């Protein structure tokens, strides 16, 4: 038997007046998701616990059975692992956005127009930076998918207790990065980062990629916004923890990084952009191939619904959910326990993550079937799983796969 957890990133939402009180998931035509719900057991899930606005990183860790409060040191190390950087003890890693700033250093687009190309050239320019007075700090910078990138600082006397530069909204300048614990290490790191942010604008505003984007009426990627500082955590390998050979199919560096740090085989998919324009057919083919291989467990993350939620794109979110549904019919099998869920809610009305629970459906051999006949936030709440937490998912899956040890006599 194989176990598959498919996470549609940010799929869950809230009822909207524009949809006559329905959520985007309820409004979408999802015959395959409905079939999964009808053939299995359903419920709603708090990725971490009720009311917690989970990040994609902490929610995935929780769903995989890791305690995010113990192993999560920040987003940066996972992003770095996801783009293939060998982060060493003492390194401090950050997730970065390519963003757009005007001549007054006001952020006008936090994602540089959802930039898709040219980022490798921009990254090489950042990677060549040195900061005067801090020549002992090596700057390692690499692009990830879309507007995402990774920064690693390597050198003596650095600390990870620093704040973020990202103002979280347009119309404001980058936040001044501050030491959070007052230590000399964190103060040094904060000073280096503030210089990097300022000097990134100076060296990127006339970069050929950006002059070309401006000529085409596109937002330039002329500044970087570091956030999510973290040192490399110790994470127990998934196969050691569960005795399951595992693979990860994901689009973003963040989730690939979780796969890498937990020891999964990470399968790259050409055309997987992490956006609503992603090549779902290629993703489907990669999933089918992985299911046919000798893996016991697959973690799958598809990201476009989250992007649409962050952009407030209601129609785009509905359409993307329908596109995902169209690839699911070919992925079911008689020897597969298939779990369909989201990692958090990203309501289009909020344009950010919220603490609302997400729907979850589990189907497979001898799964107890409840009376739910469609897959949505509202329908799943009436299911046999009732309300669970992300940390329950692996226990339930292992029990179904007959991989769970008995507790007690």
Swiss-Prot record:
Pathway: Carbohydrate degradation; glycolysis; pyruvate from D-glyceraldehyde 3-phosphate: step 3/5
Isomerase is among the record's keywords: yes
Ion transport in keyword set: no
Alphabetical keyword list: Glycolysis, Isomerase
GO terms under biological process: glycolytic process
E.C. code: 5.4.2.12
Enzyme class: isomerase
Biased composition, class Basic and acidic residues, residue ranges: 163-173
Start and end residues of each stretch annotated as Disordered: 163-184
Molecular function via GO: metal ion binding; phosphoglycerate mutase activity
Reactions the enzyme catalyzes: (2R)-2-phosphoglycerate = (2R)-3-phosphoglycerate
Protein family per UniProt: Belongs to the BPG-independent phosphoglycerate mutase family. A-PGAM subfamily.
Function field: Catalyzes the interconversion of 2-phosphoglycerate and 3-phosphoglycerate.
Protein name: 2,3-bisphosphoglycerate-independent phosphoglycerate mutase 1
Organism: Methanothermobacter thermautotrophicus (strain ATCC 29096 / DSM 1053 / JCM 10044 / NBRC 100330 / Delta H) (Methanobacterium thermoautotrophicum)
């Amino acid at each position: 038997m194989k176990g598959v957890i498919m996470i549609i990133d940010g799929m869950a939402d809230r009822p909207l007046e524009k949809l006559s009180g329905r959520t985007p998931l309820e409004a979408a035509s999802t015959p395959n998701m409905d079939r999964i719900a009808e053939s299995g057991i359903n419920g709603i899930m708090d990725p971490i616990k009720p009311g917690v606005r989970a990040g994609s990183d902490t929610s995935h860790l929780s769903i995989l059975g890791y305690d995010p409060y113990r192993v999560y040191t920040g987003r940066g190390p996972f992003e770095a692992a996801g783009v293939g950087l060998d982060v060493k003890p003492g390194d401090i890693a950050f997730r970065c956005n390519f963003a757009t700033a005007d001549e007054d250093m006001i952020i006008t687009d936090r994602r540089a127009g959802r930039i898709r190309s040219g980022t490798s050239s921009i990254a090489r320019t950042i990677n060549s930076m040195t900061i005067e007075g801090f020549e002992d700090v090596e700057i390692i910078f690499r692009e990830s998918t879309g507007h995402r990138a990774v920064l690693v600082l390597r050198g003596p006397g650095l600390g990870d207790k620093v704040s973020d530069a990202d103002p979280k909204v347009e119309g404001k300048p980058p936040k001044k990065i501050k030491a959070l614990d007052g230590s000399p290490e964190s103060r040094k790191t904060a000073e280096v980062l503030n210089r990097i942010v300022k000097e990134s604008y100076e060296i990127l505003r006339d970069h050929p990629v950006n002059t070309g984007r401006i000529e085409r009426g596109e937002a330039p990627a002329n500044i970087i916004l570091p956030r999510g500082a973290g040192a490399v955590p110790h994470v127990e390998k998934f196969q050691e923890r569960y005795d399951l050979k595992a693979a990860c199919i994901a689009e973003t560096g963040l989730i690939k990084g979780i796969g890498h740090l937990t020891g999964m085989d990470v399968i790259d998919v050409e055309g997987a952009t992490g956006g609503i324009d992603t090549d779902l057919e290629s993703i489907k083919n990669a999933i089918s191939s992985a299911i046919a291989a000798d893996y016991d467990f697959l973690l799958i993350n598809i990201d476009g619904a989250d992007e649409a939620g962050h952009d407030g794109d209601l129609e785009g979110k509905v359409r993307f959910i329908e596109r995902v549904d169209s690839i699911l019919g070919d992925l079911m099998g008689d020897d597969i326990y298939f779990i369909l869920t989201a990692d958090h809610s990203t309501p289009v009305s909020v344009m950010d993550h919220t603490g609302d629970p997400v729907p979850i459906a589990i189907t497979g051999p001898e799964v107890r079937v409840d009376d739910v006949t469609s897959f949505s936030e509202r329908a799943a709440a009436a299911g046999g799983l009732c309300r669970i937490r992300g940390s329950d998912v692996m226990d339930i899956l292992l029990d179904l796969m007959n991989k769970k040890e008995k507790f007690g006599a």
